[in-house]
Amino acid sequence: MSTIMVLNGPNLNLLGTREPATYGYETLADVEVMCREAALSLGHEVECHQSNHEGVLIDLIHEAGRRIKAGEVLGVVFNPGAYTHTSVALHDAIKGAEVPVIEVHISNVHAREAFRHHSYISPAAAGIVVGMGVQGYVLGIQGLVHKLKA
């Protein structure tokens, strides 16, 4: 049983209390339970991480790359939060570590402020789920497994 890493970027630890009209009332813990259940139903395990620090997320992507090569990890479902719009370093980490990533956004970033319309992550991602609420994580897991035929 391989592992799917679920990575969450800055401020996602505030899910459930931060702008619930935009992000909903589910907490990060709720999302992690949903992810575990979705992965288990597909024969996989989930390992969840959240960090407000870009370097920590880069290190986790590098770790995922090493573990993919070792056959331990399938890929990554990643909500980079605001780093989506600013981080060339995360883009480079994904490309450099050769990690299959499904980019997830809870809200429809294209229906929000103009600065949210550009993603540095998308060109490096295997797929993108946008605007489906926290269900997007489940769709991301399903999409990753389907895309990699695991």
UniProtKB/Swiss-Prot annotation:
PROSITE patterns, per this entry?
A: DEHYDROQUINASE_II (PS01029)
Question: What residues make up the catalytic site?
Answer: 23 (proton acceptor), 105 (proton donor)
Q: Which InterPro entries match?
A: DHquinase_II, DHquinase_II_CS, DHquinase_II_sf
SS bonds (residue pairs): none
Enzyme class, UniProt record, top EC level: lyase
Keywords carried by this UniProt record: Amino-acid biosynthesis, Aromatic amino acid biosynthesis, Lyase
Q: Which SUPFAM superfamilies match?
A: Type II 3-dehydroquinate dehydratase
Q: What is its EC number?
A: 4.2.1.10
Pathway given for this chain reads: Metabolic intermediate biosynthesis; chorismate biosynthesis; chorismate from D-erythrose 4-phosphate and phosphoenolpyruvate: step 3/7
Which Pfam families does the UniProt entry name for this protein? DHquinase_II
Which parts of the sequence are marked as the site Transition state stabilizer? 18
Q: Which residues bind substrate?
A: 79, 85, 92, 106-107, 116
Q: Which reaction does it catalyse?
A: 3-dehydroquinate = 3-dehydroshikimate + H2O
The molecular function terms in GO held by this entry are: 3-dehydroquinate dehydratase activity
Gene Ontology annotations of biological process type: amino acid biosynthetic process; aromatic amino acid family biosynthetic process; chorismate biosynthetic process; quinate catabolic process
NCBIfam families with a match to the protein in the record: aroQ, PRK05395.1-2, PRK05395.1-3, PRK05395.1-4
Similarity remark: Belongs to the type-II 3-dehydroquinase family.
List, alphabetically, the HAMAP family matched.
Answer: AroQ
Q: Subunit details for this protein? A: Homododecamer.
Q: Report the function annotation for this chain.
A: Catalyzes a trans-dehydration via an enolate intermediate.
Name the UniProt record assigns to this protein = 3-dehydroquinate dehydratase
Gene expressing this chain: aroQ
